[in-house]
Each structure stands twice: as structure tokens, then as C-alpha cells.
Amino acid sequence: GLLGSGRSELVRAIYGADKADTGTLKVKGKEVKINTPLDAMKLGMAYLPEDRKAEGIIADLSVRENIIIALQAKRGMFHPLSKKEMEDAADKYIKLLQIKTASRETPIKSLSGGNQQKVILGRWLLTNPDYLILDEPTRGIDIGTKTEIQKLVLDLADQGMAVTFISSEAEEMLRTCSRMAVLR
């Protein structure tokens, strides 16, 4: 759908970031009520927002801190990650997603937009979601990273993950998605 068609509002409501006015949601065949993003995370959902700088990265934190923050929130304050778990998780996703960074302790704000987006993807993949919502994940990034993200989406879907991929680019949707819905 085009900008302004309600795509982001719809997925934000599904994820619990915004309140839904009406409707029902089923996860694994069971009707659920999602009031907060934490509710969605506990149901196996992950959401990469449209606006990387305003809603995605936490600019003053390191690459490591940005990667582990969602898993730590999902586990809760009474089950903190150890320093080794944090370092191992960050290193795993830096390598897996080929994030170009001097170290895991580099401030995320010093990375390119494409590498920031990969850090956010790593954050959500670390939570081991069943359902990944990607709102304009390739907007404003270089063509190489765009291709890497599209390939990752196809690989995740091949591995059985449900992925909702929102894009304004019809060509990208045709290349990346097995099914499409158009909002007007």
C-alpha cells in the first residue's frame, strides 16, 4: 500500500504498540489480546519499526546493548543476561548479519543506516520469534544491505518463520514475498 494507507498503524496495533479500535487477533489458532509490545513478545512476535532513528535504535547505547535489549526485556529483570551471554549474543549477530562495526561496544549512532538496521534485526532475531513484522525494513539504506535483508527474509521464511514485510516498493514485494495484501 501507499504511504498513508494505514499499514504501520495496523501492524503497530497487532504488536500492541498502539491500541486497536476493533477486531480480533489469533495466534496459533487461539484468540489473544495484545495490550503491550511485551505481550506480543511473549507470544513469539517481533516488530522492526518503520522509523529506525525514532523507534528502532537507542542512539546512546552500544551495538551490544542495542542487540540484547529486547531479549532482556522478554526475560524480565529477575532473569538478567550474564556478561558472557550478552557478548556472545552480540558477537553471533554481528557475524551472522555481517554488521560492519569496529567492536560490539561501538556506539550504534556511529554506524551507517544499513548497519543500524541490521543491529535492530539482530535484536529481534535474538528473541527467537515465530512471527516477524518488518515495517519498511529497507527504506533509506544502501542497495547492498537492502539485498542482504531481502535474502535474510527469504531464508527466514524458508526456515518456517512467518514474516510480514511492509514496503512501498512493488518490485521489492514481488521479489521478496510469497503472498501480498494491498491497503488503500
Explain the meaning of each model-derived region.
Residues 1-184:
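Glycine-rich phosphate-binding loops of nucleotide-dependent enzymes
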